[in-house]
Amino acid sequence: MVRIQELTAALSLASVVQASWIQKRNSINACLAAADVEFHEEDSEGWDMDGTAFNLRVDYDPAAIAIPRSTEDIAAAVQCGLDAGVQISAKGGGHSYGSYGFGGEDGHLMLELDRMYRVSVDDNNVATIQGGARLGYTALELLDQGNRALSHGTCPAVGVGGHVLGGGYGFATHTHGLTLDWLIGATVVLADASIVHVSETENADLFWALRGGGGGFAIVSEFEFNTFEAPEIITTYQVTTTWNRKQHVAGLKALQDWAQNTMPRELSMRLEINANALNWEGNFFGNAKDLKKILQPIMKKAGGKSTISKLVETDWYGQINTYLYGADLNITYNYDVHEYFYANSLTAPRLSDEAIQAFVDYKFDNSSVRPGRGWWIQWDFHGGKNSALAAVSNDETAYAHRDQLWLWQFYDSIYDYENNTSPYPESGFEFMQGFVATIEDTLPEDRKGKYFNYADTTLTKEEAQKLYWRGNLEKLQAIKAKYDPEDVFGNVVSVEPIA
């Protein structure tokens, strides 16, 4: 009898919670309608499109979905969220690995920004880019409006907003710095729904936080970037290696010395690692002949068998297309691409011999192909003596990893997720985290770091803040307390407002 009473009470409570949830959603929608801000009704086609996360492993249910088309719309939507007492999250490209455009949890008012994608370049070659533009579309517009370019990543569907707020790493970073290094101003909506401009001279502390602080401080409606002239010649390349275990260790040691001391600024490099391969790839801001002169000595020094399997002279547009991997370049909305995966990341200084040996041993001992899943690792040459990224101090912007030589992305996905009926396996988390541990466990605490844009959803909020923002965390917390003391724009891992 007691169990029946307990069950009845639980069902009654669930009904009350559901009714309150529906009432809150209806209230927000009514407020948006009164402010003439577009929104999606629950269970509509638009709700299904915009309300489904890119990473289906971490899909959440928003309190409501607003679709602003101007800065004023964003401000009005923020006011509706404030009136309803819910947290508010901005979703640009929607590619956050932790679904932070949803807040990383149920119940946020989500602002779907991808209808705001305008890009314009003025006579001073300053690009004004709306907060919902994606990298591919932005690159095309910059080229079309005066042959301009911006340092950014390779995935065309990634939103400019999340990319720059987290850092903005890509194949031009070693030469031209992070995306955030080109940001000179922004128009933002604050947590009280007011609209302000930020730059080095206006709300400079908030401007500092927006450059690498991961979001959660304000909602950016427009970014302003300096740009550079798109180069006429870029050479893309791939070096294919056939290394045994011993050659892996020797090769990585040689590459580390070269990356730290010799690798020229005009070159970017990434090691693409999976169960069957370890290849080098990237871009060179120059011609193929000069690139061969750079690659051949380090290939010889690395030892083992290696071959230049691709060497293609192209231009800025051509190198963008090289790394699309079948994706559409010209993307605005609607965007309906999804994956089912777990990712992790790591930043680190020069590795000890112990760490390199442990990483190689783990790869050889544990990396057999897993049926129905595909894993890979991107090992980026991040810093070093000649890196443009490393030429800026760690505290000049909120991006806290400029002193780190290396950046890794670890990624494990389920291929046939549409027909998958089982949750992501616990063994997948353990496998990827095992790779990370081979390096992380050898590092002192103050040199451990992770890249926010390659989010690890298994971190606690305390762990995430410490690893994503390292020595800049305390300053970010103070700025958060100044501009968003009630954590209106917070998510499950964002910087907390601590004075």
UniProtKB/Swiss-Prot annotation:
Glycans are attached at N330, N366, N419. PROSITE patterns: FAD_PCMH, OX2_COVAL_FAD. PANTHER family: BINDING OXIDOREDUCTASE, PUTATIVE (AFU_ORTHOLOGUE AFUA_1G17690)-RELATED, FAD-BINDING PCMH-TYPE DOMAIN-CONTAINING PROTEIN. The keyword Disulfide bond applies. Keywords: Disulfide bond, FAD, Flavoprotein, Glycoprotein, Metal-binding, Nucleotide-binding, Oxidoreductase, Secreted, Signal, Zinc. The active site is at Y454 (proton acceptor). One of its GO terms (cellular component) is extracellular region. Belongs to the oxygen-dependent FAD-linked oxidoreductase family. InterPro entries: BBE, FAD-bd_PCMH, FAD-bd_PCMH-like_sf, FAD-bd_PCMH_sub1, FAD-bd_PCMH_sub2, FAD-linked_Oxidoreductase, Oxid_FAD_bind_N, Oxy_OxRdtase_FAD_BS. It comes from Sarocladium strictum (Black bundle disease fungus). Catalyzes the selective oxidation of C1 hydroxyl moieties on mono- and disaccharides with concomitant reduction of molecular oxygen to hydrogen peroxide. This results in the formation of the corresponding lactones, which typically undergo spontaneous hydrolysis. Glucooligosaccharide oxidase is able to oxidize the monosaccharide D-glucose as well as the disaccharides maltose, cellobiose, and lactose. SUPFAM superfamilies: FAD-binding/transporter-associated domain-like. Transmembrane segments: none annotated. This is Glucooligosaccharide oxidase. One of its GO terms (molecular function) is metal ion binding. There is a cross-link at H95-C155 (6-(S-cysteinyl)-8alpha-(pros-histidyl)-FAD (His-Cys)). The FAD cofactor is bound via a bicovalent 6-S-cysteinyl, 8alpha-N1-histidyl FAD linkage. Optimum temperature is 50 degrees Celsius. Binds 1 FAD per subunit in a bicovalent manner. Residues 58-230 form the FAD-binding PCMH-type domain.
